[in-house]
Amino acid sequence: MPLQNVKVADEGSVNFQKVKEECITAMESLHKVVACYRHLALTIGGSSDSIHLRDELRRTRERAQELALSNRNKLTTALRDKKLSKKDREELERLWVEFSSCLELFHNDMCKVYELGMAVPHSATNKPAIQTGSTGNTSAIASRALNVQNINYSDSPANKASLEYQEIEEEILKVDNMITDMEMKVNVLRWTVEANTRMNDELKSTHDSSSVVLLSEEESNSKGCCSDGQLIVFLLLCGTALVAITLYSIL
């Protein structure tokens, strides 16, 4: 019986590590996609605004929703396991808080994109409504988000004429429902979740490292000043000696 219990415990720890690694990988991918979506959203209404930009926003938005849905299911299943140890549950709760915060930021960006799209509708002639903002091609930004996982999309833009505001409304509602469903299925109180590291320790380590750098720079500067001063004194002494020798020879 003891050997059996040890074997079951080992299998449980292996499964937890696997789920944890999958969740961390999915979180990293979601962070990249949400960051790319925010970067693309900043160009709406500017000189880089185009039908292709709106389509890249749509595809990046779909990718973020797929990653969020996959990660939500994994975290929900893992946190509802009653056999989890206290330490394992705390680690999953930290991932849960990180995931929900990222999802809320994505929801806010989607609302901003919707409002900007309504305020600055794209014309059928593909001309920017406002001649300001950043310039350049945005396809490289979106490609970093779309290459996170191997999911095939059509290269042809789906919205040639105008942005489908109804589709964005449905996607915003879908993300909103996902956040509500997360809070209903798993009761994780954010204010009870503790971080792995303390902010004071990070600030202290940063301050210590910066202090060491400043001290080393001051020491090097002081050494340079001392060497320069010694050289000047040596030259003055040599000049004085030469003048004395010259006067002595003349007299």
UniProtKB/Swiss-Prot annotation:
Q: Which GO biological process annotations does it have?
A: G protein-coupled receptor signaling pathway; negative regulation of signal transduction
Source taxon at top rank: Eukaryota
Q: Which residues cross the membrane?
A: 231-250
In the bilayer, the protein is annotated as:
Single-pass type IV membrane protein
Q: Which UniProt keywords apply?
A: Coiled coil, Membrane, Signal transduction inhibitor, Transmembrane, Transmembrane helix
Cytoplasmic topological segments:
1-230
Ranges in the topological domain labelled Extracellular: 251
**Chief location of this protein?**
membrane
S-S pairs: none
Entry GO CC: membrane; neuron projection
Where is it localised? Membrane
Q: InterPro entries, alphabetically?
A: RGS7BP/RGS9BP
Coiled-coil residues are 52-94, 158-187
**What does the record give as the function of this protein?**
Regulator of G protein-coupled receptor (GPCR) signaling. Probably acts by regulating the activity of some 'R7' family protein (RGS6, RGS7, RGS9 and/or RGS11).
Instruction: Tell me the protein family, please.
Output: Belongs to the RGS7BP/RGS9BP family.
Q: What is this protein called?
A: Regulator of G-protein signaling 9-binding protein B
- Organism of origin is Xenopus laevis
Mind giving the lineage of the organism this protein is from? Eukaryota, Metazoa, Chordata, Craniata, Vertebrata
